[in-house]
Amino acid sequence: MAKTLYEKVFDAHVVYEGKNELPILYIDRHLIHEVTSPQAFSGLKMAKRRMARADLTLATIDHDVSTKSIDLNACSDMAKEQITTLMQNTKEFGVRLLGLGDKNQGIVHIVGPELGFTLPGVTLVCGDSHTATHGAFGALAFGIGTSEVEHVMATQTLKQAKLKTMKIECKGQFQKGVYAKDLILYLIAQYGTAKGTGYAIEFCGELIRKLSMEARMTLCNMAIEFGAKVGMIAPDEITFEYIKGKEFAPKGEEFQKYCEYWKSLRSDEGAKYDESITLDVSKIKPQISYGTNPSQVIGIDEKIPKISDFKNQSEQKSLLDALSYVNLEQDQVIEGVKIDIVFIGSCTNGRLEDLKIAADILKGHKIHKNVKALIVPGSMQVRKEAENLGLDKIFIEAGCEWRYAGCSMCLGMNDDKANSGQRVASTSNRNFVGRQGKGSITHLMSPASAAACAIEGVICDNRKYLGV
């Protein structure tokens, strides 16, 4: 029977399936951080259990950490408590920790792939909703709750219902100035934040095969904003080349053997999906969010919708509520809206390729006098590689702040926050009410668009800096 990529990986990991029961999956990889792991470790201690496979768990500090300094004392009291607790727990249970000052510390969904901890065909979980990122490697990756984190620690298994499958085929090529971030924002804008609910989605097509691993991770990262639990891309030579030589990756002849197996991780010809979507990506323009959920997105040259554009009363109310919060009007042109802060980073767009794209636009320019711009590498490895290329000098000379690794302004959980009423051009993944600080306003966009906004001080078209 022909199978999809998702079905192949899922079925290969079923260790038990009782009658009228959910299948039990073996979990190959477990990523943890300081926010969702403390209660799980406490549960193990109360039950006097050890971890089943501490060697298959990797911990990092990312959500709470200050990006202004690698000194623990730079963090808030709550952050210090969570970070210290993770340090103690990982030491007690024998889990490797990428702590403050570690050359590999960074955002969980960036350090996993760059260390080769994420591999094609594995099951990978984390107490974080954006775990779907790792599906870019052909891994079955999804976010779990704290009780499930404890269960994986104790048993290395999870009960999981099998999801429906959706194929998203991407045809054509991007226009100049359009990136993977624009594609996923466009997809969510067209179909809504609930379209993927109950599905494992697979991105495929001629465009996907040409994308870098960084771009593929951006797509799978925001599968969750599309409503899906899982986003996957079949591995190929681009995947294998990315993995080769990384710390946790197979080595030598073993690597070649794995590559042969990984080549089988693609949907069979004739495999049936529960739903399919086909996109012509050549029509996509730089995308900007205008509201308070990731489906409220328009092209840079478009106007904010009017209430008459929606027939559904709940959608009409959502529009009015969003515009009231972000202080914008129906039928308003998005280009030219004043911004206060630019944030380039996060598990969506904090990789080296993202920083290169931003640097190419910022080079030779100064940011607007009324703008504060934070450039936050997603890991200390990304930071080092960027500095080796001189990107830090470009950012600093432009007037940006060059930070240490962490989640930073993606969420108002650390010391990088926007004040009430401040408008942020952000490369993160969520624009919810107060996401980047109480009363803050978020506009999601690509690193190229964010860099252009930093120069002009308003939402603008990045293509003018690319000769388009």
Curated annotation (Swiss-Prot):
Transmembrane segments: none annotated. The keyword Acetylation does not apply. Its EC number is 4.2.1.33. Coiled coil: none annotated. It holds the Pfam family Aconitase. Keywords: 4Fe-4S, Amino-acid biosynthesis, Branched-chain amino acid biosynthesis, Iron, Iron-sulfur, Leucine biosynthesis, Lyase, Metal-binding. Its cofactor is [4Fe-4S] cluster. It catalyses: (2R,3S)-3-isopropylmalate = (2S)-2-isopropylmalate. PROSITE patterns: ACONITASE_1, ACONITASE_2. Catalyzes the isomerization between 2-isopropylmalate and 3-isopropylmalate, via the formation of 2-isopropylmaleate. Heterodimer of LeuC and LeuD. NCBIfam families: leuC, PRK05478.1, PRK12466.1. This is 3-isopropylmalate dehydratase large subunit.
